[in-house]
Structures are given as structure tokens and as C-alpha cells.
């Protein structure tokens, strides 16, 4: 089951060619990851980092780009968990131009779980593992 977030393309997101700068697609993916916690899980991402002391640095990423997004477009971002272990999560973020349903990009991120007080690897807390597990897609 995919989690979906919608993000409006703003002036700060575009480059000189008037399309979304490629690095912003990674930002859109991470904002969707944060929204997953904030909106779907009702577990504020800031609290996960600060109070729960669990962080998710990216250890691997891939991207494919298909159709540009432009100022004023709405990006619909679908997040699916591809792989989940006790210490990491690999998620796919498929970005669509909401107005036309065109697929714009696919970003895959592998994120390790770390203890934010020591910046060392750690296991995912059981509740967070369960939240992510509910969005695991069949291979």
C-alpha cells in the first residue's frame, strides 16, 4: 500500500531552464518520507529525530527522470517500502504530475537507522518498523 503526498512546485524548486532542478526531486522524496510520519503515522518526524533519537540518513540512492515538473505544477508522490530490515529501509518514491498523471521521476532511497545522539547504527524501534512494514510491497 502506497502513502501519497502532494507538493506544490514553488519558485525555489526550479532552475534556469524553468523546470524542477534535479536535486529537488530528492527533497520531494524526503518531504514525503517526513509526511508519512507526520500525517499518516501521527508521529511527528521532529519527535522521531529529537525525542526518539532515531535518524534515517541516506546510504544509497538512484533516480530516473521522465517528464519535467514546472512552476505551479503539483507533484503527487507515492511512497512504497521495497525492503525492510531491523536496521534499514529502502523506499521507492514515484513522482507524478498530478494534473496529467504523467510519471515524472522514480527515486529509490536506502536509509539506515541511526541513534541521533551517537550517530551510530541502531535497530528500528518496533513501532516504527511496524509502520513501515504496513507499506511493504510485494517483490
Segment roles from a protein language model:
Residues 68-74, 81-139:
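HotDog/MaoC-like acyl-thioester-processing domains
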Residues 1-59, 115-139:
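Hot-dog-fold acyl-thioester-processing enzymes
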Residues 9, 19, 63, 91-94:
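Intrinsically disordered, low-complexity segments enriched in small/polar residues
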Residues 6-10, 64, 110:
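Generic structural detector for well-ordered beta-strands
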Amino acid at each position: 500500500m502506497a502513502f501519497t503526498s502532494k507538493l506544490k512546485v514553488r519558485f525555489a524548486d526550479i532552475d534556469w531552464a524553468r523546470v524542477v532542478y534535479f536535486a529537488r526531486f530528492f527533497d520531494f522524496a524526503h518531504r514525503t518520507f517526513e509526511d508519512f510520519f507526520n500525517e499518516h503515522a501521527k508521529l511527528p518526524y521532529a519527535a522521531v529525530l529529537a525525542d526518539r533519537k532515531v535518524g534515517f540518513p541516506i546510504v544509497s540512492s538512484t533516480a530516473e527522470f521522465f517528464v519535467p515538473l514546472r512552476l505551479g505544477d503539483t507533484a503527487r508522490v507515492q511512497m512504497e517500502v521495497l525492503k525492510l530490515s531491523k536496521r534499514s529501509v529502502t523506499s521507492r518514491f514515484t513522482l507524478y504530475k498530478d494534473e496529467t498523471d504523467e510519471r515524472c521521476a522514480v527515486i529509490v532511497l536506502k536509509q539506515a537507522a541511526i541513534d541521533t545522539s551517537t550517530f551510530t547504527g541502531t535497530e528500528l524501534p518496533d513501532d516504527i518498523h511496524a509502520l513501515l512494514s504496513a507499506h511493504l510491497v510485494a517483490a
